[in-house]
Design a protein with these regions (language model features):
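Glutamate identity and glutamate-enriched acidic tracts
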Residues: 17, 27, 49, 68-71
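Glycine-rich, flexible loop/turn motifs
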Residues: 3, 40, 69
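Short, flexible active-site loop motifs that bind/organize anionic cofactors or intermediates
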Residues: 2, 45, 59
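A short, structured beta-strand/loop element
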Residues: 22-56
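N-terminal first-folded block
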Residues: 1-27
Length: 76
């Protein structure tokens, strides 16, 4: 199984958009994404490198599995 590593914020935003999320607003240097059927918004900081723990928390919030994440990452 592949290991999740830190990635640039723009890549994580593209992954969320490919998963059906829409950016509804920005708050400071954070982008807020929502999707119908997902209870909580996904918040992505606009940093050069997003740490692994934030990526994992956002994947859990979005309901995206590791396999889906790597599939979407390969398309970005």
């Amino acid at each position: 199984m592949s290991r999740i590593t830190a990635i640039p914020a723009w890549k994580l935003r593209k992954i969320m958009e490919k998963a059906g999320f829409k950016c509804v607003r920005t708050e400071g240097d954070h982008f807020v994404y929502v999707k119908p059927g997902v209870a909580r918004p996904v918040v992505i900081p606009d940093w050069d490198e997003v740490p692994v723990f934030i990526i994992k928390n956002n994947l859990r919030t979005a309901g995206i599995s590791r396999d889906e994440y790597f599939e979407l990452l390969s398309k970005v």
